């Protein structure tokens, strides 16, 4: 065995142990030898993906596929690379390639569902995910993917709740633990998330971690994702204990949580990527709560509480939740703006001579209802244009597909500008300088994008529905004193867009002062919010309703 063959074996062993940075170093040494065979390119590409080097990883996987075009392993990993690069049309094509040769491949159907939804084609995505679940009813990932996508188009509370109950009925029943006595000691809160990094969820956690009463609460973080960045360092510094649980078996993590004596275990992911709901099913803590990262009930019998507010979940919403709803007396989340955000730009309408509407929401939220609303707004405002930014629009075909959807509704595609992924947070925020008025998505409202728009001086018009996901815009806008921008029908949505567009001086004035308004609003009152959250935690530990 030559040295490079031995080093390849070492790299493979490190990869099997999930020691990806070390594995990548070893594969890189093998690459320097000039090795070029299918197995090497597949494994090297996979290691690059795990180390966040997605473009290089994709290139290695493409080299592997040139040597073995129908390799399902390489194609599946290529799908992951395409997702990370925002190339959702290419991800769809790779999934269809797999299914051409293996039509019963449930993972390919599941990924196809996500790829379609990521292009705003959620109904087609739901069909593909149905197929994945039918082929493999025990695959938890496909069920989670299905529920994620369903939120993009759901308007019926009973139907959404039933879907969650049905797909979560396979979790085993585990007896509840007795409520702990916390008198004379700090309450131990455990947060479980795959997003302790630069991620949308992190911007709503930062204020909490900055303001927790550390004399009264001991903070534990259980990270379900090994990716790290400057935000990860922040969470490590602002918690008492930080544990990476990536790749560790649920039973072992549950034992660790029990040993840590956690009083309340808080899930921050729901059915989203990197969730550990299966860990919660073992009931490692006496009280378990869902918060922030998911816009609906989990449907899980082992989740005791869900944190909301009275606007997102008014009276009657309890009927659609398996958890007990705890309504905070403040907005259900608190925004911590990006610390180095650029200043808001001048109003673009003043130099353009027309109003530009915009959306920076994930393309999964671009439902038919959303496009209908936006087209009403464009119809009502002569000369107006629409700027739509989402990762998938780095692909020209995805842009063409979106413009066709506008054209089918009578809107000239020339009025629509698409933008793909923008690297760097400052550049991303600077792109709001192209937008005069943001239009929200429906029935799944924006959250981070709404907060970003407001911080950059851009007002947001939202449509209010019946479910939590369709009421987040109302909560956010009300928190900054702009509840009047929340409408309840398409006619009012369009009328409000037209009225705003006719008074650019009012828009300019609002743009100049909006950041100050937001900074001093309930949306950014981190201390007040954290005190309310801590009181909610104390409530959860009291016996009775």
What is the predicted function of each stretch?
Residues 216-218, 375-404, 408:
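A conserved nucleotide-sugar
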Residues 272, 440-449, 463-471:
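Nucleotide-sugar-dependent
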Residues 454-455, 478:
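Short alpha-helix at the nucleotide-sugar/activated-sugar donor binding site of glycosyltransferases
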Residues 392, 409, 455-456, 467-470:
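Active/binding-pocket-proximal capping segment
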Residues 1-354, 362, 368, 372, ...:
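Alpha-helical solenoid repeat scaffolds of the TPR/TPR-like class and their adjacent stem/linker regions
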Residues 470-481, 486:
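Short acidic/histidine- and often glycine-rich active-site loop of Leloir-type glycosyltransferases
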Residues 267, 360, 389, 440-441, ...:
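Thr-Gly-centered strand-to-loop micro-motif
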